[in-house]
Amino acid sequence: MERTVIALAIISVVKGDQICIGYHANNSTKQIDTIMEKNVTVTHAQDILEKKHNGKLCSLKGVKPLILKDCSVAGWLLGNPMCDEFLNAPEWSYIVEKNNPINGLCYPGDFNDYEELKHLVSSTNLFEKIRIIPRNSWTNHDASSGVSSACPHLGRSSFFRNVVWLIKKNNVYPTIKRTYNNTNVEDLLILWGIHHPNDAAEQAKLYQNLNAYVSVGTSTLNQRSIPKIATRPKVNGQSGRMEFFWTILRPNDTISFESTGNFIAPEYAYKIVKKGDSAIMRSELEYGNCDTKCQTPLGAINSSMPFHNVHPLTIGECPKYVKSDKLVLATGMRNVPQKKKRGLFGAIAGFIEGGWQGMVDGWYGYHHINGQGSGYAADKKSTQKAIDGITNKVNSIIDKMNTQFEAVGREFNNLERRIENLNKKMEDGFIDVWTYNAELLVLMENERTLDLHDSNVKNLYDKVRLQLRDNAKELGNGCFEFYHKCDNECMESVRNGTYNYPKYSEESKLKRKEIDGIKLESMGTYQILSIYSTVASSLALAIMVAGLSFWMCSNGSLQCRICI
C-alpha cells in the first residue's frame, strides 16, 4: 500500500506544467549542401542556378536579332544574290550566323582580315548602306559583264550586289584613278577586291593588261595588290579566285583607288550609324517571336538568378555561367519533423530532437501544457530578425553576382590556332574559377545559415532558463517542468520575458521539498526491499546446494567422509 502511494506521488510530479522551446518543421524535401554535410533537408531554400531556356531566338530588350539564315556575314556584306533579303537590314540587337552557312563567297576566294571584320560588326547595331561610286560612272570600263555562274540569281549568272567587277571595254582597260571623300559624320565601312585569274589567257581576255595591279590608300592605309595567276582546281565551277579587303574610312578622310586591271570596285559602303553591345552568335535556331534580356545559342534565359549552366556563350544581361549542376542557398533551417513515437516533448541546437509542424507562424517558438490546455506560440521577434538577415544576405549575393555579363565567342584564322587554343584554355580557366567560387560561396553561406538557426534556438532556450532559474527543472530535451502552477498568463510572461520569479519562488520551493521527501522515502523503501531480496536469494541458493550434495552422497556419486 505504501509503495502504491509513492508511485502515485511520483506520477503526479511528472504531470506538472511544462514549456518547451522548439523550431518549425514542414513537409519540405528541399536539400542543400554545406561545408560539412551533403543533402541536408531544410524547411526553405532558394535555387540560384538557372538551368532552363526556352529553345528560341528572341528579341533583346525589344530589338530583333539579325538572323542571317543560310547566309554568312561575308555573303551579307558583299551582297551574295542569295542574301538579297538582307540588303537593307534594320537595326539589330545581335547577329545570328549558322555554323556552316552555304551562302558566303559564291565566287571562290578569301576575305582578308575576316575575323577582325566580324569583330567590328559585332560591336555595331545598325548600318546604313550608301552609294559611293555609282555603277554607271564607269564609262571607260565594262561594269555589266562582270558576272559568274558561281553567283546565280533566278537561274542566270550574277555577282555580288555591293561591288562591281570591272572588265575591259573595246579591248582597252584604261588606268583607273578614283577618290571618295567621306563627308559624313559617321565612319564608313568600304569593301573592294581583286581577281586572280587561272592563266595569262584569262588575264588578257578580261583585262587586256598582263601586268596589272590594284592600289588603295587612305590616311592610314597604303596597299598595293598584284594578281596571282596560277592553275587551281575548280570550286563552284571556277578556277579563278577573288580576294576581298575592307577598311574604315574616318570622317573627312579620303580613299583613293588606282588600278590597271583585276579591280573589283566598291559601289556601296556601310555607314556605321549605331554602335553598341551587339555580337555574332552561332546558332541553328529560328526566331521565336519573344523578348528576353539574355540570349544563348540554345535559347533565351529569363531569370533573376545570379548563375546559369545553360551555355558558356551569352549575349545581354545574363547570369554568370558555371559548370555546377546544383547551387541552392538555405533560407530556412534543418527540416527534422518530430517523430510521433517520441510524443510531443521529444528532445536543432544539439538537444532538441525534432521540429514542430504545428507551429506555422514562425521559425522558433514555444509549446506549453498546463491545466488550461496546450498550444504553440511563435517567437516572432527572433523569427523576423532571422528572416530579415537571411533575406538581406540572399539579395546581396544576387545583386553582386547578377550584373550584365556577356561571353561571346572569338574567331581566329588558320594562322592563329595557337592563340585560339590559348584563348580557349584561358576562358575555361575563368569558368572553372567562377564555378569554384560560386560553389564555395554557397557551401559557406549554407553552413552559416544553419549555424545561425541553431544559435537562435539556443538563445531562446537560454532566455527561458535565465528567467525560470530554480522555479523549474530542465528536462534535457528543450523542455522545462515548472515546480509551480503556471496558467496561460504565466506562460505568456515567460514567452515575452516578463516572468515574475519572486512571485512563484515560494510555491516552487515547497514543491521541491515535497519532491525531495518523496524521493528519500522511496529510496528507504527500496533499500529494505533490496536487502530482503538479497538475503532470501542467498538462503534459497544454500538450500539447493545442500539438497544436491545429499542426493549425490546417497546414490554413491559423491563420497562423503565425516571426520571427528
UniProtKB/Swiss-Prot annotation:
Q: Belongs to which family?
A: Belongs to the influenza viruses hemagglutinin family.
Instruction: Kindly list every residue the record annotates as glycosylated.
Output: 26-27, 39, 181, 252, 302, 496
Note the InterPro entries from the entry.
Capsid_hemagglutn, Hemagglutn_HA1_a/b_dom_sf, Hemagglutn_influenz_A, Hemagglutn_influenz_A/B
Residues in the Cytoplasmic compartment per record: 549-564
Which keywords does this Swiss-Prot/TrEMBL entry list? Clathrin- and caveolin-independent endocytosis of virus by host, Clathrin-mediated endocytosis of virus by host, Disulfide bond, Fusion of virus membrane with host endosomal membrane, Fusion of virus membrane with host membrane, Glycoprotein, Hemagglutinin, Host cell membrane, Host membrane, Host-virus interaction, Lipoprotein, Membrane, Palmitate, Signal, Transmembrane, Transmembrane helix, Viral attachment to host cell, Viral envelope protein, Viral penetration into host cytoplasm, Virion, Virus endocytosis by host, Virus entry into host cell
Q: Known Gene3D superfamilies for this protein?
A: 3.90.20.10, 3.90.209.20
Q: Which gene encodes it?
A: HA
Keyword presence, Signal? yes
What this protein is reported to do is described as: Binds to sialic acid-containing receptors on the cell surface, bringing about the attachment of the virus particle to the cell. This attachment induces virion internalization of about two third of the virus particles through clathrin-dependent endocytosis and about one third through a clathrin- and caveolin-independent pathway. Plays a major role in the determination of host range restriction and virulence. Class I viral fusion protein.
Species in which this protein is naturally found:
Influenza A virus (strain A/Chicken/Pennsylvania/1/1983 H5N2)
- Identification of the protein by name: Hemagglutinin
Q: Where is this site: Cleavage?
A: 342-343
GO molecular function, one example?
host cell surface receptor binding
Instruction: State the remark under miscellaneous.
Output: Major glycoprotein, comprises over 80% of the envelope proteins present in virus particle. The extent of infection into host organism is determined by HA. Influenza viruses bud from the apical surface of polarized epithelial cells (e.g. bronchial epithelial cells) into lumen of lungs and are therefore usually pneumotropic. The reason is that HA is cleaved by tryptase clara which is restricted to lungs. However, HAs of H5 and H7 pantropic avian viruses subtypes can be cleaved by furin and subtilisin-type enzymes, allowing the virus to grow in other organs than lungs.
Lipidation (S-palmitoyl cysteine) occurs at 553, 560, 563
